[in-house]
Design a protein with these regions (language model features):
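Alpha-helical transmembrane segments and immediately membrane-proximal extracytoplasmic
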Residues: 1-294
Length: 294
């Protein structure tokens, strides 16, 4: 399984090193299976070679930005990393909540896609554009250049993608998360009057790092895609997004082997789905108490 994940990730995005680490990192939080290192590395590299051999090409984004780690940029990266964590958590929570709502519907097998499709069509008509549909490649491309993206863009993309996934349409969440991160990074750069290419590159990998709980793989991916000169800010943004996103994520079967905080305690083999369900029960009891008090 880990080797297959590594091969798929490395070949799809043209990042064989990141693919290998992703396969090692994604199944459980806080634990890396080094006994699977060689199979994952070989699988990812071979998958990438095969894809390139049959003529498949990968899109490259222009993040050619001169970079010097000044105190201003240092604190800006920490701040934007926290924003990336918030976007990761919001996306994961919204997606799981909508999945829960969809599955609770009577005749959900039929109603879920009908309702979800109708909502997406209505939102597309309201937006007046199809730019928020699909993977978001056009939005990613625009995020690396001026003018900077509006802060509303990443929120709208979160809503579109969460509804699509939550109501049963499975078109992938990885590239839309790249889009959400890139547009948020671009918006942050516009707000702080900095280079959008730098923060779009950081958001591209950091939001996914927080949502998938794979900071090492996403750091390496950022280096493979955007260059080693951005290694330090990429690593900072990915780690901050990973830590601050909490025990949330897009992969509900992901186990928690080592909590992100010493203050958090979980039973053995606890998954993110179990954490979400426990959090939801606590929230429901709290709302019930407040309702009874009022």
């Amino acid at each position: 399984l880990m080797t297959g994940i590594a091969a798929g990730f490395g070949s799809v995005f043209g990042t064989p090193l990141a693919g290998a680490i992703f396969g090692l990192e994604v199944l459980s939080i806080g634990r890396i299976r080094y006994d699977a290192l060689i199979p994952c590395l070989v699988g990812s590299i071979v998958g990438d070679i095969v894809c390139r051999g049959v003529g498949i090409t990968h899109h490259h984004y222009d993040a050619a930005v001169s970079f010097t780690l000044t105190p201003t940029i240092f604190f800006s990266v920490l701040l934007v990393g926290a924003l990336f964590a918030g976007a990761s958590a919001l996306f994961a929570e919204m997606t799981h909540a909508l999945q829960h709502v969809g599955k609770s519907l009577r005749y959900s097998t039929y109603l879920r896609p009908m309702i979800g499709g109708a909502i997406v069509i209505a939102l597309t008509l309201i937006a007046g554009s199809q730019i928020y549909n699909g993977l978001g490649l056009e939005l990613i491309e625009k995020s690396f250049s001026l003018p900077a993206q509006s802060p509303s863009v990443f929120l709208i993309k979160i809503i579109f993608t969460a509804i699509t996934l939550g109501f049963g349409f499975k078109g992938g969440e990885v590239t839309p998360l790249f889009c959400i991160g890139a547009t948020l990074g671009s918006a942050f750069a516009g707000f702080t009057n900095q280079d959008p290419a730098l923060y779009a590159a950081l958001g591209f990998v950091a939001v996914f790092a927080g949502a998938a709980n794979t900071p090492l793989a996403c750091t390496i991916m950022g280096i493979e895609l955007f260059g080693s000169h951005l290694a330090v800010p990429i690593a900072m943004a990915c780690v901050v997004a990973y830590i601050l996103s909490g025990h949330r994520g897009i992969y509900s079967s992901q186990r928690i082997d080592q909590p992100k905080s010493y203050a958090s305690k979980f039973d053995e083999d606890t998954t993110l789905k179990g954490v979400w369900e426990r959090r939801n029960r606590i929230r429901s009891r709290y709302l019930a108490v407040r309702k009874s008090d009022s």
